[in-house]
């Protein structure tokens, strides 16, 4: 699978929704959730910089658009992301950190999640860390 160079993070897709996240109006973050929920993983990966990374729970970071698209295609099918609210913070070098909390629903379970995005000055995703917001007991019950 290769990521088309002409996929722009701002391209509108047929699956564009009226997604809103309280406290967040950053288009690239909104597109991340829209494209993930639409199963458009190559388009999601195109939102990342060339050396961008995504770090799923309990895993090492996955680097690069193609690797991210392949990972999402294998692991994210059927997930429904429901971001609720977030906060944005300006950092040095014109970077922005955005934290969003919400829920991920799979066919088997739902879990509260935090997404932490680091955006470049060019509004590309440099890094996304996904954290489960569950107690150890809740995590153990997911295995049953």
Predicted regions and their residues:
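Selective for proline/serine-rich intrinsically disordered segments
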Residues: 7, 25, 54-55, 81
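Short, hydrophobic secondary-structure boundary micro-motifs
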Residues: 45, 55-56, 84-85
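Short, solvent-exposed secondary-structure junction/capping segments
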Residues: 33-37, 48-60
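A beta-strand edge to alpha-helix "cap/lid" segment located at domain peripheries
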Residues: 2-15, 69-144
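Short, low-complexity N-terminal intrinsically disordered segments enriched in polar/charged residues
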Residues: 1-38, 42, 46
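Hydrophobic pocket/interface hotspot
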Residues: 32, 44-45, 52, 64, ...
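A short gly/proline-enriched turn/hairpin at secondary-structure junctions
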Residues: 15, 53-63, 78
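Generic alpha-helical structural signal
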Residues: 26, 30, 66-69, 73
